[in-house]
């Protein structure tokens, strides 16, 4: 039924359309930057000792942790990306952050739960995209997700005759959903752009703080 002759209804609709849409808040640690850095250092030391190691704390690690603390307390991005050579502790830092979340149990008021972050290897993400697409989509839509070793997975997989680009599809969907992503990779930004294309590289620039 046409409503062209109902100015009151039109005015009501225009008022509703002009109202800001309800959006979820960006994740941030509820501490000041210095406190967050101390907690992250403790969590990293705990993660190292869990595997029988001794936590050494060179200046380079101190700088990375401070950058990480600054990012996680600011709420300015929808995630972080740890870049660097193999064996420099990126996965350890990500697991330490995961454990920190489990310990402090930050309320997620939008979903009426607490924040938590599963960690999934990029190769397994590609496996799910090919063999369990429903589970793959569930990862895409998670509020928080740790993506380990981005760049070692097959760029394309085939699922029932359909070609997919697992990490490209996942990151594009997480960009749209504004999900928090904690990513580790051995790739440098130029390699990311070459492997995943300009569109995903540009979206990652919006989504995450890159820490080398």
Identify the role of each PLM range.
Residues 1-76, 211:
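A short, basic N-terminal segment
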Residues 79:
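Walker A (P-loop) ATP-phosphate-binding motif of ABC ATPase nucleotide-binding domains
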Residues 87-90:
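Conserved glycine(s) of the Walker
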Residues 99-102:
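Walker A/P-loop NTP-binding motif
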Residues 93, 97:
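Hydrophobic positions on the alpha1 helix immediately C-terminal to the Walker A/P-loop
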